[in-house]
Amino acid sequence: RFKKIRRLGALPGLTSKRPRSGSDLQNPLRSGKKSQYRIRLEEKQKLRFHYGLTERQLLRYVHIARKAKGSTGQVLLQLLEMRLDNILFRLGMASTIPGARQLVNHRHILVNGRIVDIPSYRCKPRDIITTKDKQRSKALIQNFIASSPHEELPNHLTIDSFQYKGLVNQIIDSKWIGLKIN
């Protein structure tokens, strides 16, 4: 994980740690002009590792984004940001996207009152995301909310941290996407 962060830069969905800036990163073999292929490959890898996607999943999202109206890049980022695992991460209910995936896979999360165990579930506006009524589920989310630094919540989400409930208000605005993509 840390090799990926050193190579690609900060990936907030993968871990909260940042790459060190200093002489240990100044590898003379990596300096020089980057080719267009290398730039595109690095940006694709950033997307894959940040959102925890396989190559096939990313290609499927690109195919959907190309069919949709508007800028393919913006539509792709909107599709990725509206995934359930990413919304849990943005709400602060999980410290990382892999942690959010685990919460969903272990059936701790309800969407509109129904258990959803698919991390790639595409949330829609007015979806209500809650935890199960079980004590263990609530304790997990409570620990994440208490330990996470309270960052500014995106406009498209609202959270009620006392009831462990999140609401998707609208489709995400492009300025709230936390990943710097070229």
Swiss-Prot record:
UniProt xrefs under InterPro entries = Ribosomal_uS4, Ribosomal_uS4_bac-type, Ribosomal_uS4_CS, Ribosomal_uS4_N, S4_RNA-bd, S4_RNA-bd_sf
Where mainly found? plastid
Q: Which GO terms describe its cellular component?
A: chloroplast; small ribosomal subunit
Q: Sorted alphabetically, which keywords does the UniProt record give?
A: Chloroplast, Plastid, Ribonucleoprotein, Ribosomal protein, RNA-binding, rRNA-binding
Q: Which GO terms describe its molecular function?
A: rRNA binding; structural constituent of ribosome
The record's subcellular locations are:
Plastid, Chloroplast
CDD domains assigned to the protein according to its UniProt record, in alphabetical order = S4
Checking Gene3D superfamilies in the record gives: Ribosomal Protein S4 Delta 41, Chain A, domain 1 (1.10.1050.10), RNA-binding S4 domain (3.10.290.10)
Q: Identify the residues that the record assigns to the S4 RNA-binding domain, covering every copy.
A: 82-143
Positions of region (Disordered): 13-34
A biological process (GO) of this protein is: ribosomal small subunit biogenesis
Q: Which Pfam families match?
A: Ribosomal_S4, S4
Superkingdom field: Eukaryota
Q: What does this protein do?
A: One of the primary rRNA binding proteins, it binds directly to 16S rRNA where it nucleates assembly of the body of the 30S subunit. With S5 and S12 plays an important role in translational accuracy.
Subunit structure, as described in the record: Part of the 30S ribosomal subunit. Contacts protein S5. The interaction surface between S4 and S5 is involved in control of translational fidelity.
Hey, which family's this protein in?
Answer: Belongs to the universal ribosomal protein uS4 family.
Q: List the HAMAP family.
A: Ribosomal_uS4_B
UniProt name for this protein: Small ribosomal subunit protein uS4c
Organism of provenance: Nerine bowdenii (Guernsey lily)
Query: What gene makes this protein?
Result: rps4
